[in-house]
């Protein structure tokens, strides 16, 4: 991975410029005489730096004494802090996350996913109410403030600007994290995974370019999306025989287009198939696996169902949505025939994209599909049903136990993770990937069964806001949230070897 970004100033350059042409007392002249750096002796430069460091420390100590974080002292660098909500697994026995036994063969891990909003995608007309909160020099500090406050152990970021990669690397390293970043060569932003380097060590990494992979060696991408998945494997440190124990972490950002349901369904198959392939290697036998990111999908839509249900059955309006998306024709620009620009939501405002007979509603109640469109949908559904892995949404399976008024429908997911100017809802998820055991999983699995089957215990969740709690204006906004997305974080306890979760109850 290329960690260098053009146009950045090195620490030595910053240090050099910080003393150049500044006011400083002189031994031979009056105080506050402006002396060029070239005229200062080494001892004078050293003295100036020491005085400045002392002043900075005095300011920091003053802020700390006031109960403020000295790195984020002003109101514009604050955000709405959300509490951690622990699960009480068994009220009758008085067990809480603090009293559930932690053994040498278990590890607590806080998992976060966060779409940080790429600065290169921001257009003022898309964020008319955000004002100065859109400026990177402020927003970036708030994003780091969030990470410092919530302290995840593994974090997957989407929409990370390549030209700000040094910023992310430096700040994650200050927090004790190692990072890996990948992007499609046609995009200005990409995916980043960071991990606590006291708990984990990188083992391997894979990148999937969805556009260049045939699903089932047959079904190609219908348009150029430039979407990818980044998958890594991490060894656990401090666990007995750690060489055989770790986690597989997949970070992805699926196609955004309103008529992109079929493509998102195809991309979700590709990332699940790759995780299944990795897990089939003897080296990764028994490793826990997670898939997270921005799926641009709501819980009632086909891609979410394809990740979480076996067998996948599409019928009625759900199937109509997929077939309708197949009938949509993308522009020549998006397909790469006329432009090499980074096509995003901000670049395609028209629904018709030049065709007068385009579908107008991406979620029709019914749709008259062609024979070929029906066959293609059937083929993709069959591919999903051929998989031996599926996802369990960590929020979906247990969030209702800690925040029931914000756990919605049969899926149990919170109401939102995106609060934008034109749309609000849930798009982001953290899935635990488990074997499907050839069982019918269309009905939601009980939490205790999930934990026992997978040697995992859910400890708690970062609280998600309800729609009623959100301001009328969109995000980001000063003092509220630094992105139009809201981060999700779940703490889980992973068990290894012969230790079983149910034996601890």
Curated annotation (Swiss-Prot):
GO molecular function, one term: poly(A)-specific ribonuclease activity
Residue numbers of Phosphoserine PTMs: 62
Recorded superkingdom: Eukaryota
Biased composition (Polar residues): 10-23
GO BP annotations, alphabetical order: polyadenylation-dependent RNA catabolic process
InterPro entries: CCR4/nocturin_mRNA_transcr (IPR050410), Endo/exonu/phosph_ase_sf (IPR036691), Endo/exonuclease/phosphatase (IPR005135)
Signal peptide positions (record): none
Acidic residues bias (residue ranges): 338-347
UniProt KW keywords: Exonuclease, Hydrolase, Nuclease, Phosphoprotein
Pfam families: Exo_endo_phos (PF03372)
Sections of the chain in a coiled coil: none
UniProt region (Disordered), positions on chain: 1-75, 334-369
EC number: 3.1.-.-
Basic and acidic residues bias (residue ranges): 36-54
Annotated family: Belongs to the CCR4/nocturin family.
Further remarks about this protein from its record: Present with 414 molecules/cell in log phase SD medium.
The name this protein goes by in its record: Probable RNA exonuclease NGL3
Source organism of the structure: Saccharomyces cerevisiae (strain ATCC 204508 / S288c) (Baker's yeast)
Encoding gene per record: NGL3
């Amino acid at each position: 991975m290329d960690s260098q970004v053009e146009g950045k100033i090195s620490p030595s350059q910053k240090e050099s410029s910080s003393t150049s042409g500044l006011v400083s007392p002189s031994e031979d002249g009056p105080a506050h005489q402006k002396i060029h750096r070239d005229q200062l002796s080494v001892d004078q430069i050293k003295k100036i730096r020491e005085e400045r460091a002392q002043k900075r420390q005095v300011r920091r100590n003053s802020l700390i004494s006031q109960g403020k974080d000295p790195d984020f002292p002003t109101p514009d660098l604050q955000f709405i802090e959300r509490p951690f909500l622990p699960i009480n697994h068994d009220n009758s026995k008085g067990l809480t996350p603090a009293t559930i036994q932690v053994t040498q063969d278990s590890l607590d891990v806080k998992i976060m996913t966060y779409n940080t909003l790429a600065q290169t995608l921001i257009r003022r007309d898309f964020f008319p109410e955000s004002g100065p909160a859109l400026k990177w020099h402020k927003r970036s500090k708030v994003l780091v403030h969030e990470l410092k406050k919530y302290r995840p152990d593994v974090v997957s970021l989407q929409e990370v600007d390549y030209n700000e990669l040094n910023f992310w690397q430096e700040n994650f390293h200050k927090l004790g994290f190692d990072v890996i970043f990948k992007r499609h060569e046609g995009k200005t932003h990409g995916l980043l995974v960071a991990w606590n380097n006291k708990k984990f060590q990188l083992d391997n990494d894979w990148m999937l370019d969805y556009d260049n992979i045939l699903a089932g060696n047959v079904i190609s991408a219908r348009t150029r999306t430039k979407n990818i998945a980044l998958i890594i494997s991490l060894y656990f440190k401090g666990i007995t025989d750690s060489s055989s124990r770790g986690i597989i972490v997949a970070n992805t950002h699926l196609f955004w287009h309103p008529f992109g349901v079929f493509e998102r369904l195809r991309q979700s198959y590709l990332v699940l198939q790759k995780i299944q392939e990795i897990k089939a290697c003897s080296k990764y036998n028994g490793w826990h696996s997670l898939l997270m990111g921005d799926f641009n999908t709501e819980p009632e839509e086909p891609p979410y169902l394809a990740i979480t249900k076996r067998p996948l059955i599409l019928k009625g309006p759900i199937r109509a949505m997929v077939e309708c998306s197949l009938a949509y024709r993308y522009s020549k620009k998006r397909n790469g025939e006329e432009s090499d620009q980074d096509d995003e939501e901000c670049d395609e405002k028209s629904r018709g994209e030049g065709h007068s007979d385009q579908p107008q509603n991406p979620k029709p109640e019914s749709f008259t599909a062609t024979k070929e469109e029906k066959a293609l949908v059937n083929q993709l559904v069959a591919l999903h049903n051929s998989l031996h892995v599926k996802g369990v949404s960590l929020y979906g399976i247990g969030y209702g136990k800690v925040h029931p008024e914000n756990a919605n429908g049969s899926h149990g997911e919170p109401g939102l993770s995106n609060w934008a100017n034109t749309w609000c809802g849930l798009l982001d998820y953290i899935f635990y990937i488990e074997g499907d055991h050839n069982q019918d999983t269309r009905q939601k699995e009980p939490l205790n069964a999930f934990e026992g089957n997978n040697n995992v215990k859910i400890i708690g969740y970062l609280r998600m806001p309800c729609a009623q709690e959100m301001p009328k204006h969109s995000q980001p906004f000063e003092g509220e949230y630094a992105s139009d997305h809201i981060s999700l974080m779940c703490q889980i306890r992973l068990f290894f070897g012969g230790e079983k979760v149910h034996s601890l109850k």
